[in-house]
Structure formats: C-alpha cells, structure tokens
Amino acid sequence: MSRKARDPIVLPQGVEVSLQNNEIVVKGPKGSLTQTLAPEVVVEIKDKEVFVSPAPNVVDRPSRVQGLFWALISNMVQGVSAGFEKRLEMIGVGFRAAVQGSVLDLSIGVSHPTKIPIPADIQVTVEKNTLISVKGINKQLVGEFAANIRAKRRPEPYKGKGIRYENEYVRRKAGKAAKTGKK
C-alpha cells in the first residue's frame, strides 16, 4: 500500500468531486478536470474527503496504481482550486519572447523566429521580453508545455545561454585553457 495514499485527500472550499461511470470529475473555481480510473483502484468520497484504496480482487500491482491515482486526484484538486504555474527565463543576447494570439513567438539566436502553438487550456504571459509564465489547471499540460519551450534552446554549460526554469541551477564547465608555452 502506498504511504501517501493512506491519507485522504481533503477538498478545499468550492471544490466538488464526483464519480461518473469509470471516471472521476473534479470541479472548482478555475474549471473542471476528468480522469479515467484504473480497475485496480476504488475511489470513495465521504464528507469533503476522497479516499483511494486498492480494489479487493487485485493482487498484482495495487500499491503503485493506488499511489499514482492518489497523486493524480490530488493534483486535480490543487489545479481546479489554485492552479499551477511554471516560469522560464531566457538568457542570451537578443533572446526575447512574445505572445501573438495563440502562438508563442521566440527569438532564440537562430535565423528564423520559433513559433510554438499554445494549447487551449494553457495561459502564457511574457514579462520583460525574457520571462515566460505558463499557467493552467492541468499539472501535466503545464509541465509538458514548459518543457517543450525549454527544449527549443536548453541552457548550455559554458556560458549558460538558453531557456531555463526560474531558479534552475545549470552546472557550468570550464572552457578550453588558453595555450601558453612553446611555439
């Protein structure tokens, strides 16, 4: 049994959870999310608390799936109540970003502007041309979109130029030593 899944998920004010067929639906002030449940878990809703337990007939892999669905439901509850945000910073001469409609336009030191379509459930804002904020209620979509932006120009280890998460540590390497000595 998963250690985290032993504890119930406490629902904050304004968040409702319901079971429909084989799906769990979480509704809150920021929107609603749906997740299909695996047959290895049983979800019970009692008094503003959600309990995730293994199905009685499953012996194969109950604790892993139980912990997974506990985390998924917990993230859904947090997403519809508070939301998620990932912040990225661009470091480099001439690096800048802009949002044009539903497209994120990046100038990242290549010969052409890089355009990334923004998914419908994600809000992207650009501050000071080099700070990108990705917000949404689905933790997986927010993280995946932020990772796709970062993958366009990862921070390089010599000068640190590139796109990185805010407060991300980039391990630096020493460059080539200057040649000194005999001719």
UniProtKB/Swiss-Prot annotation:
Keywords: Ribonucleoprotein, Ribosomal protein, RNA-binding, rRNA-binding. Coiled coil: none annotated. Belongs to the universal ribosomal protein uL6 family. One of its GO terms (molecular function) is rRNA binding. The gene is rplF. It comes from the Bacteria. Pfam families: Ribosomal_L6. One of its GO terms (cellular component) is cytosolic large ribosomal subunit. This is Large ribosomal subunit protein uL6. PROSITE patterns: RIBOSOMAL_L6_1. It comes from Chlamydia felis (strain Fe/C-56). GO terms for biological process: cytoplasmic translation. Part of the 50S ribosomal subunit. This protein binds to the 23S rRNA, and is important in its secondary structure. It is located near the subunit interface in the base of the L7/L12 stalk, and near the tRNA binding site of the peptidyltransferase center. The keyword Ribonucleoprotein applies. The keyword Ubl conjugation does not apply. InterPro entries: Ribosomal_uL6-like (IPR000702), Ribosomal_uL6-like_a/b-dom_sf (IPR036789), Ribosomal_uL6_a/b-dom (IPR020040), Ribosomal_uL6_bac-type (IPR019906), Ribosomal_uL6_CS (IPR002358).
